[in-house]
Amino acid sequence: MNFFDRLFKRKSKASIPPMPSWETIVEIMYDKHLDVFSDEVVKVIYSKDSSMRFVVLKNKKGFFTYQLESIYQYDEDEWKYIGSQDNTLPAMWEPFRGIVGKSVFESIDELLKELKAEPEYKSYFQ
Protein backbone atom coordinates (compact mmCIF):
# COMPACT_ATOMS: atom_id res chain seq x y z
CA MET A 1 0.00 0.00 0.00
CA ASN A 2 1.54 3.28 -1.01
CA PHE A 3 1.63 6.49 1.03
CA PHE A 4 -1.48 8.10 -0.52
CA ASP A 5 -3.60 4.99 -0.10
CA ARG A 6 -2.78 4.88 3.62
CA LEU A 7 -3.30 8.62 3.99
CA PHE A 8 -6.78 8.66 2.45
CA LYS A 9 -7.99 5.27 3.62
CA ARG A 10 -11.25 5.60 5.51
CA LYS A 11 -11.43 4.32 9.01
CA SER A 12 -13.75 1.40 9.39
CA LYS A 13 -16.88 2.18 11.33
CA ALA A 14 -16.72 1.06 14.91
CA SER A 15 -19.48 -1.25 15.93
CA ILE A 16 -22.11 0.47 18.01
CA PRO A 17 -23.50 -1.65 20.81
CA PRO A 18 -27.28 -1.87 21.08
CA MET A 19 -28.96 0.52 23.48
CA PRO A 20 -29.42 -1.25 26.83
CA SER A 21 -32.85 -1.64 28.38
CA TRP A 22 -34.13 1.08 30.73
CA GLU A 23 -33.65 -1.19 33.76
CA THR A 24 -30.02 -1.83 32.77
CA ILE A 25 -29.42 1.89 32.23
CA VAL A 26 -30.77 2.66 35.71
CA GLU A 27 -28.40 0.05 37.18
CA ILE A 28 -25.43 1.42 35.20
CA MET A 29 -26.10 5.03 36.24
CA TYR A 30 -26.32 4.30 39.98
CA ASP A 31 -23.67 6.47 41.74
CA LYS A 32 -22.31 7.80 38.42
CA HIS A 33 -21.33 11.44 37.77
CA LEU A 34 -21.15 12.39 41.44
CA ASP A 35 -17.67 13.82 40.80
CA VAL A 36 -19.02 16.69 38.67
CA PHE A 37 -20.03 18.78 41.68
CA SER A 38 -17.63 21.42 42.97
CA ASP A 39 -19.10 21.04 46.48
CA GLU A 40 -18.67 17.96 48.65
CA VAL A 41 -21.32 15.27 48.13
CA VAL A 42 -22.61 14.43 51.62
CA LYS A 43 -25.54 12.16 50.83
CA VAL A 44 -27.38 10.74 47.83
CA ILE A 45 -31.04 9.70 48.14
CA TYR A 46 -32.46 7.62 45.28
CA SER A 47 -36.09 7.36 44.22
CA LYS A 48 -37.98 4.07 44.54
CA ASP A 49 -36.98 3.02 41.01
CA SER A 50 -33.48 4.67 41.22
CA SER A 51 -34.11 6.81 38.13
CA MET A 52 -34.04 10.04 40.17
CA ARG A 53 -31.87 11.24 43.02
CA PHE A 54 -31.46 14.06 45.48
CA VAL A 55 -27.78 14.96 45.85
CA VAL A 56 -27.03 16.68 49.16
CA LEU A 57 -24.01 19.00 48.93
CA LYS A 58 -21.88 20.88 51.46
CA ASN A 59 -19.87 23.93 50.40
CA LYS A 60 -16.57 25.16 51.84
CA LYS A 61 -18.36 27.51 54.24
CA GLY A 62 -20.30 24.61 55.77
CA PHE A 63 -23.69 25.34 54.22
CA PHE A 64 -25.84 22.58 52.76
CA THR A 65 -27.91 22.48 49.60
CA TYR A 66 -29.46 19.82 47.39
CA GLN A 67 -30.17 19.15 43.74
CA LEU A 68 -32.80 16.87 42.24
CA GLU A 69 -31.57 14.95 39.19
CA SER A 70 -33.11 12.45 36.81
CA ILE A 71 -31.62 10.11 34.23
CA TYR A 72 -31.64 11.35 30.64
CA GLN A 73 -31.39 8.44 28.19
CA TYR A 74 -29.79 9.31 24.87
CA ASP A 75 -32.09 8.95 21.88
CA GLU A 76 -31.27 6.74 18.89
CA ASP A 77 -29.39 9.40 16.89
CA GLU A 78 -27.36 10.52 19.90
CA TRP A 79 -26.49 6.92 20.70
CA LYS A 80 -25.32 6.30 17.10
CA TYR A 81 -22.88 9.19 17.48
CA ILE A 82 -21.83 8.67 21.10
CA GLY A 83 -22.05 4.87 21.31
CA SER A 84 -19.09 4.26 19.03
CA GLN A 85 -16.69 5.83 21.55
CA ASP A 86 -15.07 3.74 24.27
CA ASN A 87 -16.45 3.71 27.82
CA THR A 88 -19.54 5.69 26.92
CA LEU A 89 -22.56 5.56 29.16
CA PRO A 90 -25.99 5.31 27.48
CA ALA A 91 -27.40 8.11 29.64
CA MET A 92 -26.49 11.00 31.91
CA TRP A 93 -27.78 12.66 35.05
CA GLU A 94 -29.39 16.06 34.55
CA PRO A 95 -31.28 18.51 36.77
CA PHE A 96 -34.91 17.39 37.01
CA ARG A 97 -36.98 19.46 34.56
CA GLY A 98 -34.02 21.85 34.24
CA ILE A 99 -34.55 23.21 37.75
CA VAL A 100 -31.25 24.23 39.32
CA GLY A 101 -32.39 26.82 41.88
CA LYS A 102 -31.35 25.81 45.36
CA SER A 103 -32.09 26.77 48.94
CA VAL A 104 -29.23 26.98 51.44
CA PHE A 105 -29.37 25.38 54.88
CA GLU A 106 -27.18 25.63 57.97
CA SER A 107 -27.65 21.99 59.00
CA ILE A 108 -28.25 18.73 57.21
CA ASP A 109 -31.22 17.99 59.51
CA GLU A 110 -32.91 21.23 58.42
CA LEU A 111 -32.24 20.34 54.77
CA LEU A 112 -33.64 16.82 55.10
CA LYS A 113 -36.79 18.14 56.77
CA GLU A 114 -37.33 20.58 53.89
CA LEU A 115 -36.44 17.97 51.28
CA LYS A 116 -39.08 15.55 52.60
CA ALA A 117 -41.70 18.29 52.15
CA GLU A 118 -40.90 18.59 48.41
CA PRO A 119 -43.73 17.30 46.15
CA GLU A 120 -41.22 15.28 44.08
CA TYR A 121 -39.98 13.57 47.23
CA LYS A 122 -43.52 12.65 48.22
CA SER A 123 -44.28 11.36 44.71
CA TYR A 124 -41.13 9.43 43.81
CA PHE A 125 -39.15 8.74 46.98
CA GLN A 126 -41.61 7.56 49.67
What is the role of each PLM region?
Residues N2-M52:
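Negatively charged, low-complexity tracts enriched in Asp/Glu with abundant Ser/Thr
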Residues D5-K9, K80, E110-K113:
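Polar/charged alpha-helical tracts
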Residues R6, I71-Y72, D77-K80, K102, ...:
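A structural signal for the main folded, soluble domain(s) of proteins
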Residues E27, D31-K32, L112-Q126:
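Short, mixed-charge low-complexity intrinsically disordered segments
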Residues S38-Y72:
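Amphipathic, interaction-prone secondary-structure segments
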